[in-house]
Structure formats: C-alpha cells, structure tokens
A protein has these predicted regions:
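Short, glycine- and charge-enriched coil/turn segments that flank and shape catalytic ligand pockets
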Residues: 26-32, 346-351, 419
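Hydrophobic alpha-helical and helix-loop surface patches within well-folded domains
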Residues: 37, 85-105, 110-407
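Hydrophobic pocket-lining residues within nucleotide cofactor-binding pockets
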Residues: 42, 176-177, 470
Length: 535
C-alpha cells in the first residue's frame, strides 16, 4: 500500500490527468507546463495511472444545462440514505471520507469529462448527462463515495478494454459513445462500482480478481436501474435478461478456454500465501489472452447473484453497505466476504449453505456452476426474453418465405412493420439467437439491418451483427465489419478469430488488410493475440 505525489512536465497545450485528489492547474515555463498531483489514501501502487494527451474538457452548453441535475434534486430520489453515524474504520490512519459527515451526505462528487475534440459533441450528448445520475445511484446503494472527485476520460480505439477505473480517474473507450445511452450508462456504472470494489477495497491475492470484476459486474445492473429510475418490476425484468445474456456468454467462455483459467480462487486454501522472500505468485498473470476473458466477470457475478437469491436483493444490498463500512481501505480475500455474509445471515447454515459449499460449487472449480442450471428456465420465461423469442420466430419465417418466393416478388415495407422495436439488450439476444439459425437469406439480413438500424446501434449490438455478417458471408456489409475492427478494437479480437475459423479467402484477406493497417496503434497484448490467430 502506498501514497504518492508527482510533478509532471508536458508540452504546453497538452493535458495531464493522474490518480490524484486535487484538480491540478498547470503552471507554465516556456514551451512546457507543469502539473502536480498527490494522494493521501494508501492504495496498491498498481492502481496508479497517468494520462497525457491533447484532450478538451466537455462542458454543458446552454441547451444541456437543464439535463445536469443539482445535488438536491438527486438526493430526493434516494431512498437509502447514508446513516448519520460514523463507522469505525479498520484501515491505517489517513483522512477517511467515511468519517466525514459532509462526505457521507454527498450524492455525487465533483467530476470532469475529457475527450478528443472530435468526440466532444458526442460526449456532451451521451456521456456528460449520465455522470451525476450514475454517481448518485451508486451513493444510494453503497453510501459514502471513497474518493473526493473523479475525472472521466474518453480514450482512443486502441485501448485494450471498454473501461478502466483508477483512483480519481475513469477511462472509457470511445466505443461507449456508440448507439444511444445504454452501453455508456452500463459501462460507466461498472467503472464507478470499482471505486468501492477494486480500489477502496482490493484483493489481497491478485488471483482473486473476481472480488473486483465480479462485484462491479453485479453492481452495474443495480446502479444503472437506479439511475434510470426503473420500477422494481422493470428492474427485475432487465436483470433477468442480463442474466440470460451473461449465462450464454459464460457457456461460450467455458467451452473456449483452458480449465485452469476458469477457477475464481486458483490458489484455493493457499490463497494469499507469501514465500520466504516475501514474493507472491500471480497465476497466469503473463498470459496475454487472459485479459480478453470474461470468466471472472461472469462467474463472479453469478456467485453474488446466487447469494442474493438466498436472502433477497434488499437485504443483500444492505449487507453490501455494511461490508463496505467495515472493510474500506483494506485488502481482502473471498473468505472475508463470505465469513461476514454467513455471520450476518447465520440462519442459512440450517438450509445447508456454508463457506465450504460456496468454495466447492463456485470458487474452487472450473466449468459451469451447477446451482445456475436451475435458474436458466426462469430467465427464458421472463417477458423481455419471450418478446425476443417471438421476434426470432418471425424472422426465421420471413427468411423461409423469402427463399421460397423472393424470386417472384419483392419484399415490401409491410413485411417489416410487424416486427417489434426492441431494447439494446433484447437486440443483442435476438442477434445471438439468429446466429444459431443455420441459414438466413441475404434479403433477410438486409431487412434486419434496415429495420433495427443496426449500423447506428451500440457496439455490443453491432458486434453481434458483425458475427452474422461473417457467418453468412454477407459481403454487402463487409464495410460494417471493417469499421468495427478499426473503431472498436477491444471488442474486435473475437471477430478476428471468427474470420479466421471461417476459412473464407475473401474474409481472410480482409483480416490481413485490417491488421496491417492497425497493428502499429494496437494495444501490445491485442496485437500479440491477433497475430497468433492469423499467422
């Protein structure tokens, strides 16, 4: 654990952002500017980040000011206010916000948004109005914000993930600005959740990364539903749809990854052990492919989903807040969370739940957790999923009729208007289910794109569209595929694999052209993984 301070010189006109408590104002000396930052809260040195570049601050124009809520308007929507009592802290001494009544009452902390000038207007429209509501939603659930301020920075297409959180700074890929506000809101909520789980509370053993990523994945749904002010029933429906999508993704991950990489607690009872020299070993830490895996996100999410089902969401979220109050500023192990959970809900022991059972069924084993199998039927019967299944049936019938009769008649717009409009996550599921259909006519793909305006949807939806384009060798939309590989590099790695596996000469030429064009700007890990796929 460490604190830090830094004085950074950079070319005049550039911007320096850092993991720092203060909003640094530069001083100038000729062609250079100097920026000074500091942190007083001890954190793992690995959380330190610095960004230097030519970005502009995104501020609300007059037409947007009405969309930026005031602290008072946000606080009125929060039904779970922080307790006025001050928790006792278990960490080393530092100026802790959890001991500060003013910090406790802050629904959202001061924030700034930065982006390349070319994305300023898009960030102003999509991202800026979401920051305060998402911060407030997080406060409603977990209480005191661990950090006094936050900068949100839009990073280039070559960034290796959709987002990353560090103390006082959140990095978001430009991909989150695609579509409307759904993907941006969800990812922003995920990174905000890391302020509590991943930063204020960290994993004592780095192999237990589910403590960070699984928790943030679980909380992103809760925060986003709160930020949207959804009813309890609407939030439940969204959660069921997301659970089904994550279950399908987890199945794919398990089928296409090594078993060793699927274990959430790979060191088991030896977790957090230190050698005589003081060193610890992080299993698979140098595996470049691991950073593109989502097992720890997904499986970790389902661990928490399982525990939530045992006690109910309201009680589970109250427990989360208690856990944060006790363990903020500390490094933890899985057993710390589970021990406090079993201590809080001791009646579960009589129902057969124990820490050992969670280890055996969830944390210490590869593959799909057996307790999950009972939940899948419930998810598929939810209203939002049934709507998608009905639309899939319509599209399959549309394709069959087209194959039989399209040579004699043209499809009219009346063939399309009967299709229902879908939410972004519903569109993702629709395209995934259509991907499982053996064949779809070119005309069906054409109308599918037109009806849902797939080129204007967010990157998650467009990724599934690209998978359909690859599978059916729909050459008309190869431009969509090239655009995706260039503009959404963190997500494009999966498409490179599918393009090569398809063994189509034209598609493989496309892969090589894109890689040659992009390789110099690619993230090194991504470049290595893609190069191994195609050469």
């Amino acid at each position: 654990m460490a604190t830090w301070q830094a004085s950074v010189w950079a070319p005049k006109g550039s911007l320096v952002l850092m993991s720092g408590e203060n909003c640094a104002e530069p001083s100038h000396n000729g062609a250079l500017s100097n920026w000074s930052y500091y942190v007083t809260m001890p954190m793992p040195a690995s959380t330190f980040t610095i960004a230097v570049g030519y970005w502009v601050e995104v501020k609300p124009e007059c037409t947007f000011r009405s969309q930026i809520p005031s602290p008072s308007s946000l606080s009125s929507t929060c039904t779970n206010k922080s307790s006025v009592s001050l928790p006792s802290c278990g960490h080393s001494a530092y100026p802790c916000r959890f001991q500060n009544p003013i910090a406790q009452a802050q629904d959202w902390i001061p924030y700034r948004v930065f982006a390349p000038d070319c994305l300023k207007l898009r960030s102003q429209e999509i991202l800026l109005p979401l920051v305060a509501p998402c911060l407030s939603a997080a406060h409603c659930v977990l209480g005191t914000h661990p950090f006094s301020r936050v900068d949100v920075l839009i990073v280039p297409a070559s960034f290796s993930s959709l987002g990353m959180a560090s103390p006082h700074i959140i990095f978001l890929s430009q991909s989150v600005l695609s579509g409307r506000k759904h993907l941006c809101g969800v990812r922003l909520c995920h990174e905000i959740a890391h302020a509590w789980f991943g930063l204020a509370i960290g994993a004592r053993d780095w192999t237990e990364e589910w403590i960070s990523e699984g928790f943030a994945t679980y909380l992103e749904d809760v925060f986003w539903a709160n930020a949207q002010k959804l009813s309890e029933e609407a939030a439940k429906e969204q959660h069921q749809l997301k659970s089904l999508l994550r279950w399908r993704r987890l199945q794919d991950e398990v089928q296409n990854s090594e078993e060793e990489l699927q274990v959430l607690r790979p060191n088991k009872e030896n977790t957090s052990e230190v050698s005589d020299s003081g060193a610890t070993i992080v299993k698979h830490g140098l595996n470049p492919g691991k950073i593109f895996m989502q097992v720890h996100y997904l499986k970790g999410y389902f661990v928490l989903h399982y525990l939530e089902n045992e006690v109910g969401q309201k009680q589970f979220l109250k427990f989360f807040r208690l856990f944060v109050e006790r363990f903020h500023g500390q490094l933890i192990l899985s057993q710390d969370f589970l021990h406090m959970f079993m201590e809080k809900f001791s009646e579960l022991r009589s129902q057969g739940l124990s820490m050992e059972a969670v280890y055996q069924n969830w944390l210490d084993v590869a593959g799909l957790p057996k307790p999950l199998l009972d939940d899948t039927l419930k998810w598929t019967e939810s209203r939002l999923v049934r709507e998608v299944q009905d639309e899939v049936t319509k599209w399959v019938e549309f394709s069959k009729k087209d194959r039989k009769g399209s040579r004699k008649r043209k499809c009219s717009r009346k063939d399309v208007v009967t299709f229902k409009e879908l939410l972004p996550d519903q569109l993702v599921l629709l395209l995934e289910l259509l991907f499982a259909v053996k064949s779809l006519s070119s005309r069906t793909l054409q109308w599918l794109q037109k009806h849902y305006c797939l080129r204007e949807q967010d990157a998650e939806v467009r990724h599934r569209w690209c998978e359909l384009v690859i599978k059916h060798k729909y050459t008309v939309a190869y431009g969509d595929l090239i655009n995706f590989l260039e503009q959404h590099q963190a997500m494009g790695v999966y498409l490179y694999g599918e393009l090569m596996v398809n063994e189509d000469a034209r598609q493989q030429q496309l892969v090589h052209r894109c890689f040659i064009k992009l390789q110099e700007e690619m993230d090194p890990s991504l470049q290595k993984v893609v190069a191994e796929m195609i050469f």
